[in-house]
Design a protein with these regions (language model features):
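Flexible phosphate-sensing "switch/lid" loops adjacent to ATP/NTP-binding sites
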Residues: 1-176
Length: 177
């Protein structure tokens, strides 16, 4: 059973991915068999694993930092924006359709949760340390009921959660308060 640590943010672009990448490297150098995990990622560009599965590039960088090959279980749900309020949904590395944001969150995200759980179980049984990255902010109450990437994952994995905030830039969390 892997030890787990989770990072969530006050918003997107606060540094969760780079921090998770750094920690993957640190744990790897300390001798832990480490794996990154992000249940759901949104990105225009993806990476194709040697098994032909699409995953987010951030998880690829994190896998490289951990000294392992990227695998689909690191990022079971990938949303690739296709236009105004819609995305191509990639589940376990394979495209399954294009959904509006509303359709995805109300009809599909909880269906994808089964694959997320399977991925967590696989990683948990094959690694010593799991570095888990949330997405956006856990405080987005409009998404809470169908959340498959933040607090639901924290509860599912029983991982301690660290909140990341950004003080740099025009739209930092401190300027929103």
């Amino acid at each position: 059973m892997a030890k787990k640590i989770m990072f969530q943010g006050t918003s997107s672009n606060v540094g969760k991915s780079i921090l998770c990448t750094a920690l993957c490297r640190i744990f790897y150098r300390k001798g832990f068999k480490t794996v990154p995990f992000k249940a759901q990622n949104m990105a225009l560009n993806s990476y194709v694993t040697k098994w032909g599965d699409e995953i987010g590039r951030a998880q690829v960088a994190q896998a490289e930092a951990a000294g392992i090959d990227p695998i689909v279980q690191m990022n079971p749900v990938l949303l690739k924006p296709t236009g105004n309020q819609s995305s191509q949904v990639v589940l376990m590395g394979k495209p399954v359709g294009v959904y509006s944001a509303k359709e995805y969150h109300t009809k599909y995200s909880l269906t994808a949760l089964d694959k997320v759980k399977e991925s967590i179980d696989f990683l948990d049984s094959n690694f010593d340390m799991m570095v888990i990255e949330g997405a956006g902010s856990p405080a987005e109450v409009n998404l809470k009921a169908n959340d498959i990437v933040n607090m639901r994952i924290a509860k599912m994995t029983q991982a301690p959660v660290f909140l990341i905030a950004d003080k740099i830039g025009r739209a930092s969390c401190w300027e929103r308060v």
